[in-house]
UniProtKB/Swiss-Prot annotation:
InterPro entries: BACK, Beta-prop_ATRN-MKLN-like, BTB-kelch_protein, BTB/POZ_dom, Kelch-typ_b-propeller, Kelch_1, KLHL38_BACK, SKP1/BTB/POZ_sf. This is Kelch-like protein 38. Disulfide bonds: none annotated. Keywords: Kelch repeat, Repeat. Residues 34-101 form the BTB domain. Residues 136-237 form the BACK domain. Kelch repeats lie at residues 284-331, 333-382, 383-430, 432-478, 479-520, 522-572. The gene is Klhl38. The lineage of its organism: Eukaryota, Metazoa, Chordata, Craniata, Vertebrata. SUPFAM superfamilies: Kelch motif, POZ domain.
Amino acid sequence: MDEELPDAVVFKDQNFSSDLLRQLNGLRQSKILTDVSICSGACEVPCHRNVLASSSPYFRAMFCSHFRESREAKVQLKGISSTTLEQVIAYVYTGEVHISAANVLPLMEAAAMLQYPRMFEACSSYLQSQLAPSNCLGLVRLAEILSCDSLKKKAREVALTYFPEVAASADLKELCVMELRDYLGDDKLCGEEEKVFEALMAWVKHDLQARWRYMQELLQQVRLQYIHPAFFHHFIASDALLQSSPACQAILEMAKKQIFSLYGPSAQDCKLWHTPPRSSYQDFLLLLGGRKDNQQTTRDVLLYSIQTGQWQSLAKLPTRLYKASAVTLHRSVYVLGGMAVREGKGLISCSVYIFSMKLNQWRMGEPMLAARYSHRSTTHRNFIFSIGGTGEGQELLGSMERYDSIRDVWESMADMPMAVLHPAVAVKDQRLYLFGGEDIMQNPVRLIQVYHISRNTWYKMETRMIKNVCAPAVVLGEKIIIVGGYTRRILAYDPQSNKFVKCADMKDRRMHHGATVMGNKLYVTGGRRLTTDCNIEDSASFDCYDPETDTWTSQGQLPHTLFDHACLTLQCIPHMTSLS
């Protein structure tokens, strides 16, 4: 008779379980067939042993084993308030519980004690939804006490993501040294190293006598090589507390070599400085100015995220600048010189504008010594070099000046051997390289001009390999890549061997384009291209070169055609900037 017949069906009442639970709760509320009272102090809640035993391993062990409680009519639960007990029993019979800021902690503790994992996770989810920089450290500790991994993970993520705000809270000063060290050393910490250092010092000074001995251990978690040199000079190097520790002094001396020396630290000192920036930093591609859609010079500033593939507009340049130059230094953007275009008139400028990604604002910087446009600029350590260009009298400039970002001053450096326009420029191994360009008669110059940075001297080398004009150069690995320049050709120059290697050609003959490096790949933007019938067209192309495979791939199109623009890589923490 138990065998299923061919025409048999299985009926399942979807509402039966919930109806049964509702009826059982009605019996409980009417005290019908109840056989035990769960008590908290003077509060007694009548229940059914079989329902409780079925709902939780805790009650199953209590009522189905030979414990005293299995025979008692009243069972006293310690550590649970009467209100919380009533809410838990109501949950057992209905599957519902109202969670609020007022009851979430006692409910969570009761759920942990009485072994109701779903209610426990519901409380955890509620707390996760309430997480903020002001409470995340406290909730990390609560999660540890309650062994709630999901809450601990989420609360720690908030603490790391919003570390500058968390560092300002009183809770940070109450961390033990192990906890603080774990936060400061975490690669996922989102915050400038200046903020990391300030948090360390605030924690130590909160209880100086007891915490001073941890200074060295904590200072080693700060990635000093990424601190702005001016901040290091003014607030760290001369700090009396750090100077009182020989071990901290040694760390600071090593940092000084990395931050201030033209050469960097010696080989034996390099171990500390191999640490990359924290993983919260991302590289973004930045386009500034240039000629847009064959119109007049634009003030637009565009940002591109490789992660999202999206373009975003940032604060416009303060004025229209024709053939200015731009660089990034210490995660700020510097726009130098150019011809300021106002009401159809051009004024050659020595002005410097500095852009803060964090504030999405421009400000004036210290002006250059000479007004120039069509010049080239590059950076090395704490310096910006502004090279050549055209002067106020439309003369071809052979001069070079250097900006010291620590002292905020410009100073004249040695003139280049031969004044050229539109060369490709890059810095590698303490040397500044100028490839090609054109002379005053617009003839291509087949020269490499090399500037020794620490000696302030130039020399030049003739080569038949060079014929580039209006081409950018970038450093990619150990090579300097010269990208086009009225040609499709891509040349990789090895400074050590003084040899060129030809790479895969671009699709078009390009000039007046931009190029930058992100993630060991070369990105080329816009420019002008020579068509097969020798016409010149503005370009909106956006291409990527992979040196590993020696291949080009299209990244789509720029928002519009663009040439004579700046193309830079800017590193920042997305949620701490105008991107958020």
